[in-house]
From Swiss-Prot:
Any one GO molecular-function label of the UniProt entry: structural constituent of ribosome
Keyword Ribosomal protein: yes
CDD domains in the record: Ribosomal_L30
Gene expressing this chain: rpmD
Protein origin, superkingdom: Bacteria
Single GO cellular component term: cytosolic large ribosomal subunit
Keyword Ribosomal protein appears in the UniProt entry: yes
PANTHER family: LARGE RIBOSOMAL SUBUNIT PROTEIN UL30M, MITOCHONDRIAL RIBOSOMAL PROTEIN L30
Family: Belongs to the universal ribosomal protein uL30 family.
Name of the protein this chain belongs to: Large ribosomal subunit protein uL30
Alphabetically ordered keywords of this record: Ribonucleoprotein, Ribosomal protein
Subunit structure: Part of the 50S ribosomal subunit.
Biological-process GO terms, alphabetical: translation
Length: 59
């Protein structure tokens, strides 16, 4: 695995549960089409898996 992961929010969080919104905030994704670069760790991977239907992930 690479040391970093690029994550882009491609679907809106409007109408989603508070837990999904909390995960997106934890990843630093607040607006659509925002891209963040995160360290590749099991914690980050778990958060990505929880909201994968809203994200685009680049290794």
């Amino acid at each position: 695995m690479s040391a970093e992961v690029k994550v882009t929010l491609v679907r809106s969080h409007i109408g989603k549960s508070t837990s999904v919104k909390a995960v997106l905030n934890g990843l630093g994704l607040t607006k659509r089409q925002k891209t963040v670069t995160l360290k590749d760790s099991p914690e980050v991977r778990g958060m990505i898996n929880k909201v994968s239907h809203l994200l685009k992930v680049d290794e």
